Amino acid sequence: MFAARFDPTKVVREEPKIIPQKRAIPDDVESSDSDQDIEDGVEVGAVSKEQSGTDVTTTRAVDGKSESDSESESESESDSDDEMNFDMGGSSSSSDDDEVSSKDADVDDDGKHTSVLSRFKKTLSIQDKISALEEANTQDILEDGEAHDLAQIPQPAVVRDKKLQVKDISEMKNTAFRDTRKVHYDNSMTKSFEEYSDDLTPKLLNNIEKYFSKSTFPIQTAMLDQYLKLINFTLKTSKKNFTRRIGDILVNASTGSGKTLAYSIPIIQTLSSRTVNKLRVLIILPTKLLINQVFQTMSQLAEGTSLVITVSKLENSFNEEHKRLLKTEPDIFITTPGRLVDHLTNSSISLRNLKFLVLDEADRLLNQSFQNWIPEVMSKFKSDKFDQMPGSIIKMVFSATLTTNTEKLNDLQLYNPTLFATDSVKLYNLPPTLQEYQLQIPSAKSVYKPLYLLKLLEQLSGGKTLVFVRSNESSLKLEVLLKSLIKGHMTTLQIVVHSINSNNSKAENRRLVTDFTKESLPNQTNVLITTDLMSRGIDIENIANVINYDVPISSQQYVHRCGRTARANKDGKAYNMLVGKGEAQFWKDSIDEDISRDVSGCKPISYNDSYNKVHGDENARTSEPTRDLFTSIDSETSDKYNEILKNLTQK
C-alpha cells in the first residue's frame, strides 16, 4: 500500500576506479598552447549511460601518476568502464522508480563536479610545468651571461646623405647680400661737385657748395656716379617706370661719411621737375634728434624751390599735424616709425604717389619693432598704390652697421638691390683720420677709474669731449663724482661737466646739447656725459675726443660712438678705458675683430706707452723707470680721493 521508504544508510557505494586521461606535453610547450587547450575545453572525463541506466562511467585526471601508468590505464579504459558500477544495496533492475530517479540525479551531479575539478587540476599541472621550464631557461641565461652595469645600447653608425643636408641657420641668416649687385668704393674716390654740373640743376649745385662742401665724400661719389645720369635719363623717357630702372639701394658706410647728403642729392634732383606737390618721399628715422638734422639738410638743398618738406614728431600735437597734412600734402615727409603708424591709421597721408622710401640708421629701425611698423607700411603700399608690381618704390637703406640678416631685410621686399660697401671682409669701417688709444687700468686700481678719467681730461686740455657710459644711472653718478673732484681741487684746469639723463626734462637736455655745440672758451674743456642715445647720427661739429668710459657691448656700438668725432675728414681721437685683462680681451675678441681700418689710416696704440714717452724725462730719476706713469698715484692724492668718496657716500 505504501511505497517502501528509502534508507540512505543501506546505500553502499563502491569507490570508482580513477582512470586519468592525460595528453603528452612536450618540453618546449609554450603558454599560448596551454591557454588554447584550456580554452578548447579539453575533455578529461566523460559520463555515459548504458541502456539499463544503472552503469555510469567516469574518468578523472589525478596528479602524481607517471606518464607510463596513464598510458596503460588509458588503453584499458573501455574495459574498465563496464566494471565501474554502483551497487544499490543489492537491488536489481526491478527496483522502485523513485529509487532509480534519486540515484540518477546524484550521479549526474557527481559527474559535473568531477569534470570541473579535472579541468582545474589540468590547468595547474600545465602551469607548473611551464614555470619549471621558465626557471630553467632563466638559470641558464644567468649562468652564461656576465653581470655588468647599465650601459647604452650600441647604435649603428648614422648614414648621412650629403645631398640632403640642410645648411646651418646661422649661415643662412648672413647671406642677405649673396644675390645683390655690389659696388665697392674706397677713401680715394673724391671729386669736385663742379664735375656734376651737367647732371645737377644750377640751384641744387649752388646750395651744395654754399651749405656743405665743394668736393664729394667717397660714398657720395659712388652713388652720384651710379645714379645721377640714370635718373635724369629715365625721368625723360618714362616717369612711371623709372623706379624699376633704379632698383633698391643698400649702403654700408662709416659714420660721418656723408650718407645723409648721399641720398638727399638724388632725391632733390628727382623732385626738381615736379609740378604738383604729392607725397613722393618718406624718410624714416629712429629719433627726433635725427629728424631735425635731416630736415635741415633737406631744407638747405631745396632752398629756392617750391618743394614742401614736413616733419612729424611725438612732441607735436597729433591733431594739429593731422589737420596740417590733410590741408597741404608734402613732397617730403620726415618722421619716426611710431608717429608714421599713427598717421597711416588715421589716413593723414596717402602712399599712392610714393617713389622713395628712405631708412636712415636702418639697423636700429629693423632691430626694433616700433609698433610693427614695417608690415603696416608694406600693407599700406598694397592698398594705396595703383601699381602693384614689384619695384614701384625705390627703397634706400643706410647705416654705418648695415645688417646682413636676411630675416630682417626680407620684410622690406627688396627689388633688384645694389649694395654700396668698402672692399673689406670685416663688418664695419672706421674713418681713416680717427686715432684710437687703449688706456689699460689694472684691476687692483679700478676704484681710481674716475680719477684716471679726470687725469685724462687734464691731458686733453681744451675742446669738446664726449664721454660714453653704460646706463643712465652711471651718467648721473659720474657727473656728481667729477664735479666733486673738481671742487675738491683735484685739478687746476677749468673743466665744465654736464650729463644727458632721464632726470632732466626734454627741454633741459636740448639746452645742454645746444650749449655743448657752441665754441668752448680758451683753456676750457667742455665734457658731456651721455649714454648711447647720442651715439647715432647726431652731427655736432668739432668734437675733438670721444672717451669710452664703459666698454661698448658690441663692435656696432663702438663704431657709432667713435663716429661722433673724425667726421667729414677731420681728425678725431677715441680713448678706450679698459679695466683688467678681461675687458682688454673682450675688446680684442668682440670689437676689434669686426672692424676694418684704412691701410694708410691710424692704428690703435697704447695710451699708457705714449704717456710714458711724453712724461718719461720728468720722471727719469725715479727708481722704477719701467712702471706705468699714468696709473701711478701717490699716497697724498689717494687719501684726498678717498676722502671725497667718503663724503659723497655719507650724503
From Swiss-Prot:
Its main location: nucleus. A motif (Q motif) lies at residues 216-224. Residues 7-17, 100-113 have a biased composition (Basic and acidic residues). Residues 240-420 form the Helicase ATP-binding domain. A motif (DEAD box) lies at residues 360-363. GO terms for biological process: maturation of 5.8S rRNA from tricistronic rRNA transcript (SSU-rRNA, 5.8S rRNA, LSU-rRNA); maturation of LSU-rRNA from tricistronic rRNA transcript (SSU-rRNA, 5.8S rRNA, LSU-rRNA). Keywords: ATP-binding, Helicase, Hydrolase, Nucleotide-binding, Nucleus, Ribosome biogenesis, RNA-binding, rRNA processing. Disulfide bonds: none annotated. Gene3D superfamilies: P-loop containing nucleotide triphosphate hydrolases. GO terms for cellular component: nucleolus; preribosome, large subunit precursor. Residues 452-611 form the Helicase C-terminal domain. Residues 49-60 have a biased composition (Polar residues). Residues 27-42, 69-85 have a biased composition (Acidic residues). Its EC number is 3.6.4.13. It comes from the Eukaryota. Associated with pre-ribosomal particles. Belongs to the DEAD box helicase family. DDX51/DBP6 subfamily. This is ATP-dependent RNA helicase DBP6. It comes from Candida glabrata (strain ATCC 2001 / BCRC 20586 / JCM 3761 / NBRC 0622 / NRRL Y-65 / CBS 138). The gene is DBP6.
